[in-house]
Amino acid sequence: MIKYYNRKTKQYEIEKVAGENYLNWTYSSPIGMSFLEALIKKKAFSSIYGSFCDSKISKGKVKKFIDSFDIDILESEKKPEAFKSFNDFFTRKLTKEARPFSTNKEILISPGDGRLLVYENIDLDNLVEIKGMGYSLKELIKDEKISSKYKNGICMILRLCPTDYHRFHFVDSGVCSATSKIKGSYYSVNPIALNKVKRLFCENKREWSILKSDNFKDILYIEVGATCVGSIIQTYKENTKVNKGDEKGYFKFGGSTVVLFFEKDSVKIDEDILEQTRLGYETKVFMGESIGKK
């Protein structure tokens, strides 16, 4: 059971997990763990399932998924019958009205939909996925010079589950560097998996870049792949001016994670999010929602 905080209702809610029985079996049974290490975490498995989700055959999954998880399809630019495949639905674009955001330069917005944890005054050598399982930023991006910039800064972890909108955006205007890609495995990023696989973010496929933002200093973006996420698609133009709210990229089918690092004293995160993180709960947020101030 995964409990998260709804900041609008100020209540805790239970996450409806896509494939929960599969996740519990895979990460909690000896046979499941054997399959995980031998096949499921491999690129080939995610590539094969990704090809299925790109095919016309997978279109039949769309309506059932929408109904099972109460997806608000009215937010989508396309109607359900217009999707050509499950991935076409999964990577759907939303109407501009669906995710409004403040143009105030002092306001920091969420880069996407998901469940958010934020850590302040971070120790670069002991970043935490869950209690007792740490890793270093240097291990995560394999660049010591870049890592050192974020000493005592802020780490923001946005977990996207399969039921979420899967495009991610720029939280500020600025210029974004080219993307560095790091090969890795394809473990699930669900808390069920995080409790079982040590240093999971350092094991999974991931990509990173630097947004030289106009208002929040240099922001490190890291996109982490997961089971069945055969592709992390970057849609922005490197070393070219971007605007706040512009799309940066998207994930194909599967749960995924966007991790942002901020330099010390560059932003103050909203207290309710920090408090829930201290209590061990993620906070549900939507792309464009205000989550902090300069």
UniProtKB/Swiss-Prot annotation:
Keywords: Cell membrane, Decarboxylase, Lipid biosynthesis, Lipid metabolism, Lyase, Membrane, Phospholipid biosynthesis, Phospholipid metabolism, Pyruvate, Zymogen. It comes from Clostridium acetobutylicum (strain ATCC 824 / DSM 792 / JCM 1419 / IAM 19013 / LMG 5710 / NBRC 13948 / NRRL B-527 / VKM B-1787 / 2291 / W). It is an enzyme of class 4 (lyase). GO terms for biological process: phosphatidylethanolamine biosynthetic process. GO terms for molecular function: phosphatidylserine decarboxylase activity. Its cofactor is pyruvate. The keyword Membrane applies. The modification Pyruvic acid (Ser) is found at S256. Binds 1 pyruvoyl group covalently per subunit. Catalyzes the formation of phosphatidylethanolamine (PtdEtn) from phosphatidylserine (PtdSer). Pathway: Phospholipid metabolism; phosphatidylethanolamine biosynthesis; phosphatidylethanolamine from CDP-diacylglycerol: step 2/2. The active site is at D113 (charge relay system), H169 (charge relay system), S256 (charge relay system), S256 (schiff-base intermediate with substrate). Belongs to the phosphatidylserine decarboxylase family. PSD-B subfamily. Prokaryotic type II sub-subfamily. This is Phosphatidylserine decarboxylase proenzyme 1. PANTHER family: PHOSPHATIDYLSERINE DECARBOXYLASE, PHOSPHATIDYLSERINE DECARBOXYLASE PROENZYME 2. Is synthesized initially as an inactive proenzyme. Formation of the active enzyme involves a self-maturation process in which the active site pyruvoyl group is generated from an internal serine residue via an autocatalytic post-translational modification. Two non-identical subunits are generated from the proenzyme in this reaction, and the pyruvate is formed at the N-terminus of the alpha chain, which is derived from the carboxyl end of the proenzyme. Its EC number is 4.1.1.65. Heterodimer of a large membrane-associated beta subunit and a small pyruvoyl-containing alpha subunit. It catalyses: a 1,2-diacyl-sn-glycero-3-phospho-L-serine + H(+) = a 1,2-diacyl-sn-glycero-3-phosphoethanolamine + CO2. It is found in: Cell membrane. The record marks G255, S256 as: Cleavage (non-hydrolytic). The keyword Ribosomal protein does not apply.
